């Protein structure tokens, strides 16, 4: 088991602090360009509120991943190319984040927002091993393995479903962030303690994202 040494603690602190710094900057930019949530039946705000906080979280995650993480990882022998591992996820996230930012300003039609999510899902399916390619029936059941075509459709459908589920609950301050932190923390625990082989980079990537989201909370 690879320990979370002091270098990795600094990585997480860096993600947290960077998110704190970027959040007010993104808030000012959002107000200037009109990326705001207008009052409606789903929201409790009575005046337009900046709606691009996710951009601060994403930028904090990306900067931490590309600049701080390699400094920590270089001190340990790890048989994985981290950039090859995470770059497609970042590109997919960039597509979704950009689509969301444009939607915050211009209120895109649903078909265009869906197109952005589908493109991101295809990138992740094509260039990573994050795929819905099997399902283990609990309590001693068999492992069901899916063919490439079904794997493709299930993976894309899963990413679309999760993304839209998050969008649907985005009506109360802190709700999406809280749900995301709980979900990500569960994933981190499972990936570090309960997989047949520890996926350390997956765990650390998830925890970096958690730190970025937590940094968004104080502001």
State where each predicted segment sits.
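"…together with the soluble PPM/PP2C metallo-phosphatase catalytic core" -> "…together
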Residues: 2-219
């Amino acid at each position: 088991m690879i320990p979370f040494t002091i270098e990795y603690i600094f990585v997480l602190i860096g993600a947290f602090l960077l998110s704190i710094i970027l959040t007010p900057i993104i808030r000012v930019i959002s107000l200037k360009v009109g990326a705001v949530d207008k009052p409606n039946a789903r929201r409790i705000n009575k005046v337009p509120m900046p709606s691009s906080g996710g951009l601060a979280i994403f930028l904090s995650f990306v900067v931490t991943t590309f600049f701080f993480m390699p400094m920590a990882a270089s001190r340990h022998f790890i048989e994985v190319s981290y950039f090859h591992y995470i770059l497609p996820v970042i590109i997919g996230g960039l597509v979704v984040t950009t689509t969301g930012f444009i939607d915050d300003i211009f209120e895109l039609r649903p078909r265009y927002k869906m197109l952005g999510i589908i493109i991101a899902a295809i990138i992740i399916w094509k260039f990573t091993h994050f795929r819905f390619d099997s399902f283990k029936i609990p309590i001693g059941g068999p492992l069901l393995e899916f063919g490439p075509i079904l794997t493709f459709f299930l993976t894309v459908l899963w990413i679309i479903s999760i993304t839209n589920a998050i969008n649907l609950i985005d009506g109360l301050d802190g709700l999406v962030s809280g749900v995301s932190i709980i979900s990500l923390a569960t994933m981190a625990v499972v990936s570090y303690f309960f997989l047949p082989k520890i996926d350390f980079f997956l765990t650390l990537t998830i925890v970096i994202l958690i730190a970025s989201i937590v940094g968004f909370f104080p502001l």
